[in-house]
């Protein structure tokens, strides 16, 4: 690779490629979450019969992975480039390899392997058949066919591609620490994210208010359930995401025992399942508008 793309250029290249494949370019969702899959642009849109093709960058917070900015590859917050396509194109794997070529990675010149790694997110009632994608010995992506989301069967088949932007960028720029990555215009990743990484790690492991976190989880759960009863799916889902992030903070703080952990995950899963069910019911009442739109376009 003659020119080393900045993180910014990698994002722009992926956006252009997937937009050309018919994906809408969405923006990052503004509630904390542990993975791009948890954005409503994937979680809610993967269920039901309506077609959906979208791509977006999603900052993902995992408090227990924080290392005060001292570890070159483990982060409190990392970034994913998320692609979700429903129904899944038959050539989606080839499209993924083409996207790597656009980044200057020729599959014929590199060792690219799809390593079986079936995926699940028990707290959100999600599961699928999947593969890790390894590039010359480094995992750079996760490739998944959803089977279940929010406890509901996924039909038609939905494919998800998640690029780990920090790992992919580290490979392309040939750096050993994410903090040495060029984000754009000569500005380093560490210039932007090192201080937040340290502060968020310190908060998660040392300074968070344990009583407050316990109270917040309970109150967020109550509000999610109340809005489900009100038929307000999206506010309910926001509070479900807040419960998930609050639980992750509690877990990082060492507040959750093994037996308590299962109970908290059950509570989050029950919220997610109720929200998914209500979302599909509401879309059905509206006649699945995006399905109608797709049918009209094919006439």
Swiss-Prot record:
Reactions performed catalytically: tRNA(Gly) + glycine + ATP = glycyl-tRNA(Gly) + AMP + diphosphate
SUPFAM superfamilies with a match to the protein in the record: Class II aaRS and biotin synthetases
Keywords noted in UniProt: Aminoacyl-tRNA synthetase, ATP-binding, Cytoplasm, Ligase, Nucleotide-binding, Protein biosynthesis
EC number annotated for this UniProt entry: 6.1.1.14
Protein localization: Cytoplasm
Gene Ontology molecular function: ATP binding; catalytic activity, acting on a protein; glycine-tRNA ligase activity; transferase activity
GO cellular component, one term: cytosol
Superkingdom of origin organism: Bacteria
Signal peptide as annotated in the record: none
One GO BP: glycyl-tRNA aminoacylation
HAMAP family in the cross-refs: Gly_tRNA_synth_alpha (MF_00254)
Record note on quaternary structure: Tetramer of two alpha and two beta subunits.
Family (UniProt): Belongs to the class-II aminoacyl-tRNA synthetase family.
Stated name of the protein: Glycine--tRNA ligase alpha subunit
Organism name: Lactiplantibacillus plantarum (strain ATCC BAA-793 / NCIMB 8826 / WCFS1) (Lactobacillus plantarum)
